[in-house]
Amino acid sequence: KYIAEGVDFRCGYKGSTDVSSIKYFAESNGVKYDFVEPVYYHIAAGEDERISSSYIRSMVLKHFLSTAQELLERPYSVQLEFESGVENKSGGMSFLKSRINQVLPPCGVYYCIVFQKEVRVEITEQEIIIEPAESSNLFDMANLKSEKVFVIEFQ
């Protein structure tokens, strides 16, 4: 068991849980912990931004997926459950945005990776539509739904 947080981390009701609370909890429960100094991302000459989950979410919302990928050191991804989607006639699936708890990029068309294959992802005001780039369908790609969850990697 291990916890790593920033030196200025706060959470809980009115930010009542801080690093001293985490340290006490960790020591009381045999959990290893580290508190790390902030890390900054160089935006432009003389301008740095502190890297945080809030900053990464803002990059995704602004459609700066390459910046989000650079900050995460991996593609930005969204996890979806098969049972929350509806299969469509073209072998793809549709998901209501209201059932997705992760931040999504703005409405538009994206080429992404699902099950190591390229897919076309269309994000509308109401839903996410995933269409295979090949003549297969997502259920085939997932070995007939043996996977309950899949991940969309935005490239």
Model-inferred region functions:
Residues 75-78, 83-155:
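Phosphate/ribose-recognition catalytic cores of enzymes acting on nucleotide-derived substrates
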Residues 1-92, 153-155:
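Classical nucleotidyltransferase
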